[in-house]
Amino acid sequence: MAYAWFLRWRRKDPAELERLRRLDVNTRGRISAGRIVDLVEGETAGSKSRLVVYSYEVAGVTYEAAQDVAALPEIAAMVQFLAGQTASVKYDPKQPANSIIACEHWSGLGLLSH
Protein backbone atom coordinates (compact mmCIF):
# COMPACT_ATOMS: atom_id res chain seq x y z
CA MET A 1 0.00 0.00 0.00
CA ALA A 2 2.78 2.44 0.87
CA TYR A 3 4.45 1.76 -2.49
CA ALA A 4 1.24 2.61 -4.37
CA TRP A 5 1.01 5.86 -2.41
CA PHE A 6 4.62 6.67 -3.28
CA LEU A 7 4.03 6.08 -6.99
CA ARG A 8 0.96 8.27 -6.96
CA TRP A 9 2.53 11.16 -5.11
CA ARG A 10 6.13 11.03 -6.32
CA ARG A 11 7.43 14.16 -7.98
CA LYS A 12 7.72 14.05 -11.72
CA ASP A 13 11.12 14.91 -13.11
CA PRO A 14 11.50 18.02 -15.31
CA ALA A 15 11.68 15.96 -18.52
CA GLU A 16 8.36 14.27 -17.73
CA LEU A 17 6.73 17.60 -16.84
CA GLU A 18 7.92 19.06 -20.16
CA ARG A 19 6.60 16.01 -22.06
CA LEU A 20 3.20 16.42 -20.38
CA ARG A 21 3.18 20.16 -21.22
CA ARG A 22 3.94 19.44 -24.88
CA LEU A 23 1.15 16.87 -25.09
CA ASP A 24 -1.31 19.23 -23.38
CA VAL A 25 -0.55 22.07 -25.81
CA ASN A 26 -0.83 19.60 -28.69
CA THR A 27 -4.27 18.48 -27.49
CA ARG A 28 -5.83 21.88 -26.97
CA GLY A 29 -3.59 24.15 -29.00
CA ARG A 30 -4.43 26.36 -31.93
CA ILE A 31 -2.09 26.69 -34.87
CA SER A 32 -0.41 29.92 -35.96
CA ALA A 33 2.23 30.66 -38.58
CA GLY A 34 5.70 31.14 -37.17
CA ARG A 35 9.34 31.41 -38.14
CA ILE A 36 12.41 29.55 -36.91
CA VAL A 37 14.76 32.23 -35.58
CA ASP A 38 17.76 30.23 -34.37
CA LEU A 39 19.10 26.94 -33.06
CA VAL A 40 21.06 26.99 -29.80
CA GLU A 41 22.95 23.87 -28.77
CA GLY A 42 24.36 23.38 -25.31
CA GLU A 43 24.92 21.07 -22.40
CA THR A 44 23.62 21.41 -18.85
CA ALA A 45 24.04 18.96 -15.99
CA GLY A 46 25.49 16.38 -18.35
CA SER A 47 22.61 16.36 -20.82
CA LYS A 48 22.66 17.93 -24.25
CA SER A 49 20.05 20.47 -25.24
CA ARG A 50 18.90 21.63 -28.65
CA LEU A 51 16.82 24.75 -28.36
CA VAL A 52 14.77 25.84 -31.34
CA VAL A 53 14.08 29.56 -31.02
CA TYR A 54 10.97 30.60 -32.91
CA SER A 55 8.57 33.52 -33.17
CA TYR A 56 4.85 33.72 -33.89
CA GLU A 57 1.99 36.19 -33.62
CA VAL A 58 -1.36 35.86 -31.84
CA ALA A 59 -3.94 38.68 -31.80
CA GLY A 60 -1.37 41.27 -32.85
CA VAL A 61 1.16 40.27 -30.16
CA THR A 62 4.48 38.81 -31.29
CA TYR A 63 5.90 36.04 -29.12
CA GLU A 64 9.38 34.58 -29.18
CA ALA A 65 9.87 31.22 -27.52
CA ALA A 66 12.35 28.37 -27.36
CA GLN A 67 11.74 24.65 -27.13
CA ASP A 68 14.32 21.99 -26.34
CA VAL A 69 13.82 19.28 -28.95
CA ALA A 70 16.60 16.97 -27.72
CA ALA A 71 13.93 14.53 -26.44
CA LEU A 72 12.47 14.36 -29.97
CA PRO A 73 15.30 12.72 -31.98
CA GLU A 74 13.67 12.98 -35.42
CA ILE A 75 13.12 16.71 -34.93
CA ALA A 76 16.50 17.33 -33.27
CA ALA A 77 18.30 15.80 -36.25
CA MET A 78 16.65 18.14 -38.74
CA VAL A 79 16.39 21.54 -37.02
CA GLN A 80 19.95 22.62 -37.80
CA PHE A 81 18.86 23.19 -41.40
CA LEU A 82 15.71 25.18 -40.63
CA ALA A 83 16.81 28.63 -39.37
CA GLY A 84 14.85 31.33 -41.19
CA GLN A 85 12.19 28.88 -42.39
CA THR A 86 8.48 29.20 -41.72
CA ALA A 87 6.81 26.71 -39.41
CA SER A 88 3.50 26.08 -37.71
CA VAL A 89 3.32 26.77 -33.98
CA LYS A 90 0.71 25.35 -31.61
CA TYR A 91 -0.18 27.60 -28.69
CA ASP A 92 -2.56 27.43 -25.74
CA PRO A 93 -5.44 29.82 -26.55
CA LYS A 94 -5.76 30.71 -22.84
CA GLN A 95 -2.01 31.37 -22.50
CA PRO A 96 -0.60 32.18 -25.95
CA ALA A 97 2.96 32.33 -24.60
CA ASN A 98 2.68 28.58 -23.87
CA SER A 99 3.55 27.04 -27.23
CA ILE A 100 5.29 24.20 -29.02
CA ILE A 101 6.94 23.76 -32.38
CA ALA A 102 6.82 19.95 -32.10
CA CYS A 103 5.84 17.09 -29.80
CA GLU A 104 5.68 13.30 -29.90
CA HIS A 105 2.58 13.31 -32.14
CA TRP A 106 2.81 16.54 -34.14
CA SER A 107 5.39 18.74 -35.81
CA GLY A 108 5.02 22.24 -37.15
CA LEU A 109 8.14 21.60 -39.17
CA GLY A 110 6.47 19.15 -41.55
CA LEU A 111 8.64 16.27 -40.30
CA LEU A 112 5.88 14.18 -38.71
CA SER A 113 2.37 13.45 -39.84
CA HIS A 114 -0.16 15.93 -38.50
Language-model-detected regions and their locations in the chain:
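Oxidizing extracytosolic/periplasmic lumen-facing domains
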Residues: 2-114
